[in-house]
Amino acid sequence: MHRPLPDAPAGVPADDPRHQRVRDAVRALVAEHGVAVSMDLIAARAGCSKQTLYARYGSKQALLHQIGREGMAATRLPEAPSAGTLRDALVAFAEAHLAHLAEPQTLGTARLVTAQAQEFPEEVAQIYVSYAGALVDRLAAWLQQAMRRGLLRHDDPHCAAELLLGMIVGLDFDRQRHLAPHRDTPEARSQWAAFAIDSFLRAFAPPAPRY
């Protein structure tokens, strides 16, 4: 069990230019140093003082947590699922998630952070909470809405979210990590995304009405 991370103090909007500089610095430095990145390095890269970072974000953990949540924002879903847009929304989500995983910075960061797991177990575990864990929670909440609206059969939404993410990613991220041939074009990723979503929707189709 890992301690939940506090959110950054209020007043740090994602579109603030100063925050954007910090965000860019964090993403670049985590790709270079993994979880060993320090607030001194972040401050130097972002062009601010370490004291400013602590005043705005509270701690390195809270800062990484906020950047992690913002990194997942690209894989958005509509606020509420509907019958007419369910498939299209999930396909768009899958395509965005696969595109994010295909970014060189994402792949490099994953390799580096995994290699640091023995040396920094708590920090690496919190990276999971901030990124993959938060994504599962958000997707589960959305799927639960779809289940309540009768668009999907009722089941454990967290299990459904984990299964769906596994279907979307398949083995392709492992192929990339091991330098094996993979789906390296948007067209190939889109084709797989549609296949994964259609398979998921068949598996979780609501029961036919009884007359």
Predicted ranges, named:
Residues M1-R45, A55, Q61-A62:
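Basic, helix-initiating cap at the start of DNA-binding domains
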Residues V91-E123, V169-D172, A208-P209:
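Helical hydrophobic small-molecule/effector-binding pocket
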